């Protein structure tokens, strides 16, 4: 298991389209992927779980991955949320 704290820099946070793209990217990996905010941990492959966190720009979250491709999943997803687009 690997984990990393990251600051979400997406202009709209993880809302609507960015959240859908994040979930789509997370589903490309075989590892289990989770996102944690303020002690609430959700499956990052679930759009409903991700939306329930209400992650806005500037929010610090913890990405957690466990499985065969955990390191690659963590790196790609961390890079995605840290993009300033």
From Swiss-Prot:
Q: Which residues carry this modification: Phosphoserine?
A: 46
- Its source organism is Bacillus subtilis (strain 168)
Q: Does the keyword Ribosomal protein apply?
A: no
Q: GO biological process: any one? A: phosphoenolpyruvate-dependent sugar phosphotransferase system
Q: Report quaternary structure and partners.
A: Mixture of monomers and homodimers. Interacts with CcpA as a monomer.
As a miscellaneous remark, the entry gives:
Not phosphorylated by PEP and by enzyme I.
For this protein, the record's PANTHER family field holds: HPR-LIKE PROTEIN CRH, PHOSPHOCARRIER PROTEIN HPR
Q: Which SUPFAM superfamilies match?
A: HPr-like
Q: Which PROSITE patterns match?
A: PTS_HPR_DOM (PS51350), PTS_HPR_SER (PS00589)
- Pfam families per UniProt: PTS-HPr
**Is Iron a UniProt keyword of this protein?**
no
Question: HPr domain location, by residue?
Answer: 1-85
Which domain of life does the UniProt lineage start with?
Answer: Bacteria
- Protein name, as recorded: HPr-like protein Crh
Tell me, in a sentence or two, what this protein's role is. Answer: Along with seryl-phosphorylated HPr, phosphorylated Crh is implicated in carbon catabolite repression (CCR) of levanase, inositol dehydrogenase, and beta-xylosidase. Exerts its effect on CCR by interacting with CcpA.
To which protein family does this belong?
Answer: Belongs to the HPr family.
User: Which keywords accompany this UniProt record?
Assistant: Phosphoprotein
């Amino acid at each position: 298991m690997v984990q990393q704290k990251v600051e979400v820099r997406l202009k709209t946070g993880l809302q609507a389209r960015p959240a859908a793209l994040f979930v789509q990217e997370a589903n490309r990996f075989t590892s289990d992927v989770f996102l944690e905010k303020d002690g609430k941990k959700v499956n990052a492959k679930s759009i409903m779980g991700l939306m329930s966190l209400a992650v806005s720009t500037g929010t610090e979250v913890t990405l957690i991955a466990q499985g065969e491709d955990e390191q690659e999943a963590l790196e790609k997803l961390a890079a995605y949320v840290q993009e300033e687009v």
